[in-house]
Structure formats: C-alpha cells, structure tokens
C-alpha cells in the first residue's frame, strides 16, 4: 500500500519515519509523497582523458570526481549531457516496514532534468541523506538552486517488516551518508570486498 499524505503525517508524528529538516510540511507533504530539497554539495565528474574507469578501483573513482559546494541563493548550472551527483538537503530514516522510492518532480522533468539514473530505492532501515544522480537530457543549461524542491519520496508499506533492514548487516555501505557519495562498488563481495 502506498502511503497517503495523512499516512505520511501520522508516521512522521509517531516518529518511526523521520525526514529532517522538514521545514515546511504544508508545502512539502504532497497527496502521496514528500518533496525533498536540493542540498549544497555536488560531485562533478571530470572531463579528463581517462580511457576507462574501473569501478572496482576506489582510487580511480575518487580521482574522477571533484567536490563543489554551492551556497543557498546561488546556482549550480547543469549543462546538456552532464551527469553529477547531488544530495537531498533532508536526512531520512526509513522504518523496517516501509520502502521509499525517489522520483523526479514533473516540473523539472519537463525541463529534461532527471534525478536518478538507476538508484531510486531507499531500503527499509536506511538512514542518511539521499544521493541524487542528476542529468540534463535537454539541449539547454538548467540552473539548479540549493533549497529548491528537486525530488519526491513515496512510501510503500511492506506486508511484514524486513527481517534484515538496511544497516543491520553487511551490504549497508551507504548507511548514514552525508552529502553525495561516489560509487563504493569496490566493496561488493564479487569484487573482493566484504559487502
């Protein structure tokens, strides 16, 4: 069952679902979602002469990105074809009986801005800010401002709570993240890690 605005407000009031800071619930809580705002931090991928990035090499992944901070009131311009990692301003805590889905806002989609490439899911038990995989699929640059509503978070109630929620065991490499996080795929078991 997808949670309605009344369900979302009730879960927030009960404290088992947390979204902080939720500065303007009247504006941010929508009929079946919560609007999340854009944070100030971005990871920009360098336009370098790199023949190939090996996702399993933490050094190569780290060398490929630059951190950028944008103050509220200023703009981050996302150019056509660009891909950057951003973050939500809000930190979320998802209880074991809910799963959350990150979606773009239709108003930004109509400007050709997408907020996730593949990672649109927040597992039960996840805690932290949400990394956004921002792309401009259009033909004109688009200015994004920290604090603007950038995405929607919807919640689906599970038939039963997760037995092993995110953060309880291995495989929780993004638990508690602050700011955008580059890939940590090198920590996956199939690549020699313990995740």
Swiss-Prot record:
Residues 174-184 have a biased composition (Polar residues). Pathway: Pyrimidine metabolism; dUMP biosynthesis; dUMP from dCTP (dUTP route): step 1/2. It is an enzyme of class 3 (hydrolase). DCTP binds at residues 105-110, 123, 131-133, 152, 166, 173, 177. Its EC number is 3.5.4.13. It catalyses: dCTP + H2O + H(+) = dUTP + NH4(+). CDD domains: trimeric_dUTPase. Keywords: Hydrolase, Nucleotide metabolism, Nucleotide-binding. The keyword Hydrolase applies. InterPro entries: dCTP_deaminase (IPR011962), dUTPase-like_sf (IPR036157), dUTPase_trimeric (IPR033704). Residues 160-172, 186-195 have a biased composition (Basic and acidic residues). Catalyzes the deamination of dCTP to dUTP. Homotrimer. This is dCTP deaminase. It comes from Natronomonas pharaonis (strain ATCC 35678 / DSM 2160 / CIP 103997 / JCM 8858 / NBRC 14720 / NCIMB 2260 / Gabara) (Halobacterium pharaonis).
């Amino acid at each position: 069952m997808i949670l309605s605005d009344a369900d979302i407000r009730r879960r927030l009031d009960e404290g088992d679902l947390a979204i902080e800071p939720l500065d303007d619930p009247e504006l941010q809580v929508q009929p079946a979602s919560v609007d999340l705002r854009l944070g100030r931090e971005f990871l920009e991928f360098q336009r370098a002469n790199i023949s190939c990035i090996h996702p399993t090499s933490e050094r190569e992944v780290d060398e490929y990105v630059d951190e950028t901070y944008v103050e509220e009131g200023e703009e981050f311009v996302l150019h056509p074809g660009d891909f950057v990692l951003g973050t939500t301003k809000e930190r979320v805590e998802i209880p074991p009986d809910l799963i959350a889905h990150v979606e773009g806002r239709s108003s930004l989609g109509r400007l050709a801005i997408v907020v996730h490439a593949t990672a649109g899911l927040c597992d039960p038990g996840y805690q932290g800010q949400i990394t956004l995989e921002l792309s401009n699929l259009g033909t004109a640059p688009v200015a994004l401002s920290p604090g603007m509503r950038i995405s929607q978070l919807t919640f689906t109630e599970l038939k039963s709570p997760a037995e092993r929620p995110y953060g309880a065991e291995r495989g929780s490499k993004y638990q508690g993240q602050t700011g955008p996080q580059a890939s940590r795929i090198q920590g996956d078991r199939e690549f020699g890690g313990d995740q």
